[in-house]
Amino acid sequence: MGIFAKIKKAWFDTIVWETIDDEFYDELEDSLIMADLGATVAHDAVKKLRDVVYQKSIQRGDDVKQALREILIEKLNVGDTALDLSTKPSIVLVIGVNGVGKTTSIGKIAHRLKGEGKRVLLCAADTFRAAAADQLEIWANRAECEIVRSVEGADPGAVLFDSLAAAKARGVDVVLCDTAGRLHNKVNLMNELSKLRKIIDRETPDAAKETLLVLDATTGQNGLQQAKVFRETAGLTGIILTKLDGTAKGGICVAIAQELSVPVKYVGLGEGIDDLQPFNAEEYVKALI
């Protein structure tokens, strides 16, 4: 079961997989909804499962379970789950609301990339939150990477500009950019995200670029609604899903992929520096069901 062993699968414990009838399908659909796949995704998954079971004359419970896993894996395959780091530098902009774990996620990704031999620079463009740059600097020291920061209240665009200039001058492989936590319904803060993206496009036009939204798995379907607005503003390329170990509703990964057509790229499964892991659809689905 690997890294996803911490995902609770209690919603599926009561299902009798050997009795394949209408009651089974109804109970399975309810369980998928309770696990946070959402009503639409759950209904579609069960409908497809009915068709597969009928067409292949499946009778064994284990075979039904495997058929469902394959359906969910297909739903998760909406894009490359690996970061595009094909240029030097590559730019990764990390966004999200307050309290979801953006800065911590950046630090853990930096640690992972450093371990892969990458030269990493952290950009402290969260200049609104007190001590945000200090927190990022602690992570820079832990991961043994460089950081560009300014004073509290400085223009985030200026910090980003300086970071990109430093990255080009120093031969950095990856720039990880922290941003202020923002509510998806605050127009000014969302407009600032657009400004940061324009600076990246202007200063590093040929660079590989990622925009990763950090979501707290425990917020479930509410997080999904946030993500839809961020997608419109920021052009998301991937999701970092934190606190997946703290929820019984691990199915949110499937809902995100289906509703947003944006791949989950990393999942947080604990507090340790190595507990932010690249997402693997097969391992995830096997742990879930």
Question: How would you describe each model-predicted region?
Answer:
Residues 4-125, 132-177:
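Primarily NTPase-proximal linker/entry elements flanking Walker-type ATP/GTP-binding cores
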Residues 95-96, 178, 214, 268:
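Short beta-strand segments
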Residues 180-182:
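Short glycine-rich anion-binding loops that position phosphate/pyrophosphate groups of nucleotides
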Residues 156-170, 184-289:
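Conserved catalytic-core segment of NTP-binding enzymes
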Residues 39-41, 129, 245, 273:
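Short hydrophobic/aromatic residue motifs in ordered secondary structure
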